[in-house]
Regions:
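Short, Lys/Arg-rich, polar N-terminal cytosolic tail immediately upstream
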Residues: 1-24
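Juxtamembrane interface elements at the cytosolic ends of transmembrane helices
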Residues: 145-162, 189-201
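Small-residue-rich segments of transmembrane alpha-helices in multi-pass membrane proteins
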Residues: 108-112, 171-180
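Conserved small/polar residues in nucleotide/adenosyl-binding loops
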Residues: 204-211
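Early transmembrane hairpin of solute transport permeases
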Residues: 22-157
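Cytosolic juxtamembrane amphipathic/interface segments immediately preceding
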Residues: 16-34, 162-170
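Conserved, well-structured core segments that form the ligand-binding/active-site neighborhood
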Residues: 151, 167-175, 187
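Selective recognition of specific alpha-helical transmembrane segments in multi-pass small-molecule
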Residues: 175-190, 206, 216
């Protein structure tokens, strides 16, 4: 007796799709990417909690304090957090644990550079919403870019058979090279070529006019 269509479909999901998806998600780059996003979820949920709180707060202004600042410095910092955590988790998944913190901090520096802030009379100004969810696609791209630079340098195995240079000096050089390259290459794109990544990412991630008309 042949299996019912639904049973065939369930078997296909269980024995074909599930193993393929599991194998895909176990790849170091994919695992690091997903882990970087998951680690930022508590900050997203904190912001959501404040949004719900702000619905109730205006009805009891004399009792409940305004907690918008909590959301501003958690959820509204999401892109900055992603820029750090993306590199941190990728370095862990790729077995470059000595680069996790330095790589993550470089991700933050690179993301701030990509924000294209302006300095006037010693005052640095940048669009506030670029810290938050608005810039998350740019933050992911920056995180992956920095991860690639650090991964390529790590694969060179600098000073592998060198015992003459002190170990702490070796660590300095191993860190300086990927930091320098990450910021230098991005500086050429952002400052010298005057490229703003935000409109580019928005162009490719926002729905097309046709999609918007269909959703109405």
């Amino acid at each position: 007796m042949s299996k019912k269509p639904m049973q065939k479909f369930m078997d296909w999901l269980q024995y074909k799709v599930t193993p393929a998806v599991q194998k895909f998600t176990e790849r170091p780059w994919v695992h690091g990417f997903s882990a970087g996003i998951v680690k930022c979820l508590p900050f997203i949920l904190t912001g959501c909690l404040i949004f719900f709180y702000n619905v109730v707060q205006p009805y009891f202004p004399n009792i409940l304090p305004n907690l918008s600042a909590v959301s501003n410095y958690t959820f509204s910092m999401l892109s900055l957090l992603v820029a750090f955590m993306m590199v941190y988790q990728e370095m862990g998944s790729l077995k470059h644990r000595n680069y996790q913190v330095v790589g993550g901090l470089t991700g933050i520096c690179a993301y701030i550079l990509a924000m294209k802030g302006t300095t006037v009379d010693g005052v640095y100004s940048v669009t506030w919403n670029r810290f938050g969810p608005t810039g998350i696609v740019v933050a992911i791209c920056i995180g992956l870019y920095v991860s690639i630079i650090f991964h390529l340098i790590a694969k060179l195995n600098l000073f592998k058979n060198n015992n003459t240079i002190p170990e702490f000096v070796q660590e300095w050089i191993k860190n300086i090279i990927p930091i320098f390259l990450s910021i230098l290459l991005l500086k050429i794109v952002i400052i010298d070529l005057d490229v703003d990544l935000y409109p580019i990412c928005l162009l490719y991630t926002s729905p097309s006019p046709r999609d918007r008309s269909l959703s109405r």
